[in-house]
Amino acid sequence: AKVLDIGCGGGANIAKWLDKCVNGHVTGLDYSEVSVAESGKLNAAAIKQGKCNIVQGNVSSMPFADESFDCVSSFETVYFWPGLEKCFAEVNRVMKSGGTFLICNESDGTNAADEKWTEKISGMKIYNEKQLRTALEAVGFRNVESHSDAKKHWLCIVAKK
């Protein structure tokens, strides 16, 4: 499988994908030069083996060909994406038909206490399940499933292309 992790940060989730996709290839994408460098350090062995690459870029205009990936993940990053529908359409573009898009957020948009983060972190926007589902379906994703933890207010969404 070919996996893309958008907003790969320090690369921990890339390492987890590499463990799960032993015969696959994982690409990390991040806007930050620092994150790209850190992801590269953490996953240096896999990069050397040709199983991984890290790319600097923007989710709203990704440097990948159409239908490049079987699975796309976003852990704790959609909060910062510049225009949800535009970015989801770009995810849809780089995914293969039948591919899976996984979104995991530690905030489900229902906990008022989480709003403190949007005040402290410039450009952050917390979305609830309905907002994410609506934006995904608007750009052609289907079979959108949500899984949440009411106590911790976590939200995971899985959608198919």
Spans of model-derived segments:
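Class I SAM-dependent methyltransferase SAM/SAH-binding core
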Residues: 4-61
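Conserved H-loop
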Residues: 48-49, 65, 142
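A short SAM/SAH-binding and catalytic strip from SAM-dependent methyltransferases
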Residues: 71-84
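A short acidic, Gly/Pro-enriched loop at the edge of an enzyme's catalytic core
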Residues: 60-71
